[in-house]
């Protein structure tokens, strides 16, 4: 099968969810044509989110170790290629599609950290999300900085969301994550003007501290301002109380 030509044909039809499309996505992931799959993924990432074909991203992990090695070799390419490779590699880690040794893991993380400082907001956004999937305790301070100082509201939101991912994955102990993020989350709730970012920060606090302020993800996604502000006030009091208890104990 000529995967590129078949992709273009299906794309011209709007990439419909049909048996034909599903068979194409399955065959692409099981093929040895990793480069074409990556090229198609890069083309999809240039499309608006609502126009992207399903399965192109998810199916890449089917290439296993060979796909991982190909992506590692693309991390030093220009920024739009490198961020696509880094994002896919991070998803590899989450899906456990193949094992990366310590050196390979360090290479992935180093590339994501480099991309997190790029001028292009979309590149920073995707790298910050991916850092949440694969980052360690050492990366918390970098996420803290982006949470409080990044000029892009989604970069700030995804920095908070990365703490949530770290907490859910249990790669970092909850006591460490709480201690290293509490101050920045307090400052975020005090100063953040973007409702979505503030809502994501509250969701993160609910997860990392295993508590609830009555804020649902659907309320954040639909920007229910009153619900977000009400939960934010509760979360701020909660974290400040945690601070005062720690100060008293010390």
Spell out what each predicted region is:
Residues 1-5, 28-44, 63-76, 95-115, ...:
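Amphipathic alpha-helical scaffolding segments comprising HEAT/armadillo-like alpha-solenoid repeats
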Residues 1-22:
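N-terminal leader/linker segments that initiate helical-solenoid repeat arrays
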Residues 15, 49-50, 65, 79-83, ...:
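Alpha-helix N-cap/helix-start positions at coil->helix boundaries
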Residues 19, 53-54, 69, 82-87, ...:
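Alpha-solenoid HEAT/ARM repeat scaffold
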Residues 41-50, 82-92, 117, 157-163:
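HEAT-repeat alpha-solenoid elements in large eukaryotic scaffold proteins
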Residues 61, 90-94, 132, 164-165, ...:
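Structural signature of alpha-helical solenoid repeat scaffolds
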Residues 153, 157-210:
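Ankyrin-repeat and related helical/solenoid repeat scaffolds used for protein-protein interactions
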Residues 210-250:
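Eukaryotic acidic, Ser/Thr-rich intrinsically disordered low-complexity regions
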